[in-house]
From Swiss-Prot:
It is found in: Plastid, Chloroplast. HAMAP family: Ribosomal_uL2_B (MF_01320_B). This is Large ribosomal subunit protein uL2c. SMART domains: Ribosomal_L2, Ribosomal_L2_C. Residues 225-256 are annotated as: Disordered. GO terms for biological process: cytoplasmic translation. Belongs to the universal ribosomal protein uL2 family. The lineage of its organism: Eukaryota, Rhodophyta, Bangiophyceae, Cyanidiales, Cyanidiaceae. One of its GO terms (cellular component) is chloroplast. The keyword Oxidoreductase does not apply. It comes from the Eukaryota. Pfam families: Ribosomal_L2, Ribosomal_L2_C. Part of the 50S ribosomal subunit.
């Protein structure tokens, strides 16, 4: 995979950088029953309040039904196509099962069209196969890892990410996550072998503000540029200091350097915090 740069024939193209595998994706029509339209909620909750800032607008999207559970065990599936998914940074692969069923999975790196994948305890540890964690050999890269057995993969699903299985015990396995955190997982939880594809996604450059708006990302305004009524850093004459002992969030909580992770029962499974 390589990076594609553009000649600077406009100011926006000067800084634009894309991953070249974007142009190698399938242009065939995708199965209609594996996608449906969704309404953009622009970062609002059911009360209309903003719960996630800087969201709104953007291109219309259809949500693709991705199989994170891989619960169809023992049935071979052929990789027929690899598609772009606007809802995530990774690409998705279309599987045609031998019994006629079709589904999407997150496309691992180096997964080729025409290869066969399978899930189950007896599956070999090849790229794209899904196995219980206690059946994965030590040192293998894995992604789409379940936190709760049967719930579906929740960990290491972004483009270019992978975790590494570093130890096993009777009921648990020890995994090093992409963040550097070392954590225990139940051995019966499923994971997929390999690293998530589109590995050059983090090297892409947007190039212009308008492309961020296509993605539904609105501008981020500095607190010091606001009025005092809008932000703790706002107000004053000219470029004033923030007037506080430390930076604050828009809601007055301490920012920058304060640990915000809540204490949960699952902290028991964390052997070493992320770096």
């Amino acid at each position: 995979m390589a990076i594609k740069k553009y000649k600077p024939y406009t100011p926006s193209m000067r800084g634009r950088v894309l991953a070249s595998d974007f142009f190698d994706l399938s242009e065939k029509k995708a199965p209609k029953r594996l996608s449906f339209g969704i309404k953009s909620i622009s970062g609002r909750n059911n009360q209309g309040k903003i719960t996630c800032r800087h969201k709104g607008g953007g291109h219309k999207r259809k949500y693709r039904l991705v199989d994170f559970k891989r619960c169809k065990t023992g049935v071979l599936a052929k990789v027929s196509d690899i598609y772009y998914d606007p809802n995530r940074s990774a690409h998705i692969a279309l599987l045609n099962y031998l019994d006629g069923e079709k589904s999407y999975i997150i496309s691992p790196n180096l997964l080729k069209v025409g290869t066969y994948v399978v899930s189950g305890k007896e599956a070999s540890p090849d790229i794209g196969n899904a196995l219980p964690l206690n059946c994965v050999p030590l040192g293998f890269e894995i992604h789409n890892i379940e936190l709760i057995h049967g719930k579906g993969g929740q960990v290491a699903r972004a483009a270019g990410t992978s975790a590494k299985l570093i130890a096993k015990s009777q009921d648990y396995v020890t995994i090093k996550l992409p963040s550097g955190e070392i954590r225990l997982f139940r051995g019966e939880c499923y994971a997929t072998i390999g690293k998530v594809g589109n590995i050059d996604h983090n090297n892409e450059k947007i190039g212009k503000a308008g492309r961020n708006r296509w993605l539904g990302i609105r501008p981020t305004v500095r607190g010091s540029a606001m009025n005092a009524v809008d932000h703790p850093h706002g107000g004053g004459e000219g470029r004033s200091p923030i007037g506080r002992s430390q930076p604050s969030t828009p809601w007055g909580r301490p920012a920058l350097g304060i640990k915000t992770r809540r204490n949960k029962f699952s902290n028991f499974y964390i052997l070493r915090r992320r770096k």
